């Protein structure tokens, strides 16, 4: 006997709830929802959709799939609003979670496609790692978009999932692949509901790490991850993310270091130095580089400083510099030259250096 919809919402029936925020996603939804139907997970599953003021045919597509999914044993909860403007991804995810019942949460973006094994394999990992965010490897569509970023997502070691959390790439397992227990989400969450321009995934990820959460990646490609200019990611300003990253670096790493060197005497390294608090700036003993012209100059003078005399920071060759380093050189861009230079120093990532590129 099928329970009426309101009873389904109350009863804790699902083991896994798939959390799907939707805003004007008509061109992707059929493929996305078909991938929910095709999951090979044998436990109970629920799809929780929150329609964030879509003005296209998204709602009709969701209603059509509700019938197909429920016929195959996947319960569907649909929430939403039709205000003139959307309330944002953070709000939509929080609403979809609040109306769902599953003990585990599997996050899905409406423009992505899950492989049939995704829920099963991530559920198995989540049971083993109850205080972790579980991610997975991805396949990019189109395949040649963001090649460096995709390699980074797929190839980080298990240690780097925790040491490379300060880079401009953001969370070391990407939000559309997240899977975790409801209990852990409740301990960390909810998502920031600031709306467009707020990196709600990054803020949640940082809070997760502050609370001692782990990061685990299932090393199978379980998601087709689409790249297109309408994606919500593009609405977040780079400077907003930069500010959050600097703050997190100053909170998590710099208190443990008496002094440090910034690796890159160019634009990015100087920008980081200028963004630091005065207390952190005083810990910077040098910049280092391989550029002979920068090294010949001898020092960087912080012209905007209110201090007198203005701070002058030496610029050294990287082999003459002292760790620990905050590295502001982009990875995977110099044909391996930078990586070889770093390797030649025999340092330990996380202890002797962190990447901030």
Swiss-Prot record:
Catalytic activity reads: queuosine(34) in tRNA(Tyr) + UDP-alpha-D-galactose = O-5''-beta-D-galactosylqueuosine(34) in tRNA(Tyr) + UDP + H(+)
Biological process (GO) annotations held by this record are:
regulation of translation; tRNA modification
Does the record carry Transmembrane as a key word? no
Subcellular localization(s) per the UniProt record: Cytoplasm
One Gene Ontology term of the molecular function aspect: tRNA-queuosine(34) galactosyltransferase activity
Which family does the UniProt entry place this protein in? Belongs to the glycosyltransferase 2 family.
The cross-references to Pfam families, in alphabetical order and at most eight, read: Glycos_transf_2 (PF00535)
Q: Which gene encodes it?
A: B3gntl1
Q: Which UniProt keywords apply?
A: Cytoplasm, Glycosyltransferase, Transferase
Task: Identify the main location.
Answer: cytoplasm
Name by which UniProt lists this protein: Queuosine-tRNA galactosyltransferase
- EC numbers listed for it are 2.4.1.-
Give any Gene Ontology cellular component.
Answer: cytoplasm
- Function text: Glycosyltransferase that specifically catalyzes galactosylation of cytoplasmic tRNA(Tyr) modified with queuosine at position 34 (queuosine(34)). Galactosylates the cyclopentene hydroxyl group of queuosine(34) in tRNA(Tyr) to form galactosyl-queuosine(34). Mannosylation of queuosine(34) in tRNA(Tyr) is required to slow-down elongation at cognate codons UAC and suppress stop codon readthrough, thereby regulating protein translation.
Recorded hits in SUPFAM superfamilies, A to Z, give: Nucleotide-diphospho-sugar transferases (SSF53448)
InterPro entries, per this entry?
Glyco_trans_2-like, Nucleotide-diphossugar_trans
- Its domain of life reads Eukaryota
């Amino acid at each position: 006997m099928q329970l009426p919809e309101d009873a389904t919402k109350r009863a804790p029936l699902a083991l896994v709830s798939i959390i799907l925020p939707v805003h004007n996603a008509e061109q992707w939804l059929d493929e996305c929802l078909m991938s929910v139907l095709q999951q090979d997970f044998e436990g109970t599953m629920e799809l929780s959709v929150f329609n964030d003021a879509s003005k296209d045919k998204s709602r009709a597509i969701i209603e059509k799939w509700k019938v197909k999914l429920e016929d195959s044993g996947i319960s569907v909860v649909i929430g939403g609003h039709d205000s003139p403007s959307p309330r944002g991804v953070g709000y939509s995810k929080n609403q979809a979670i609040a109306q769902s019942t599953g003990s585990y949460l599997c996050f899905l973006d409406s423009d992505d496609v899950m492989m049939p094994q995704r829920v099963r394999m991530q559920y198995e990992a989540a049971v083993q790692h109850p205080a972790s965010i579980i991610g997975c490897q991805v396949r990019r569509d189109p395949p040649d978009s963001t090649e460096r970023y995709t390699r980074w997502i797929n190839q980080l070691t298990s240690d780097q999932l925790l040491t490379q959390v300060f880079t401009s790439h953001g969370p070391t397992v990407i939000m559309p692949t997240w899977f975790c227990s409801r209990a852990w989400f409740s301990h960390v969450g909810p998502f920031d509901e600031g709306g467009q321009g707020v990196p709600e995934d990054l803020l949640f990820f940082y809070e997760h790490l502050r609370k001692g959460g782990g990061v685990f990646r299932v090393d199978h490609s379980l998601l087709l991850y689409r790249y297109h200019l309408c994606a919500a990611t593009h609405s977040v300003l780079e400077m907003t993310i930069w500010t959050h990253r600097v703050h997190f670096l100053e909170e998590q790493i710099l208190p443990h270091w008496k002094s440090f060197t910034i690796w890159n005497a160019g634009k990015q390294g100087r920008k980081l130095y200028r963004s630091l608090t005065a207390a952190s700036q005083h810990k910077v003993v040098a910049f280092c580089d391989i550029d002979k012209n920068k090294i010949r100059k001898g020092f960087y003078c912080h012209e905007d400083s209110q201090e007198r005399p203005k701070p002058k920071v030496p610029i050294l060759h990287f082999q003459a510099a002292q760790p620990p380093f905050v590295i502001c050189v982009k990875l995977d861009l110099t044909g391996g030259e930078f990586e070889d230079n770093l390797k030649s120093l025999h340092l330990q990532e996380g202890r002797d250096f962190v990447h901030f590129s």
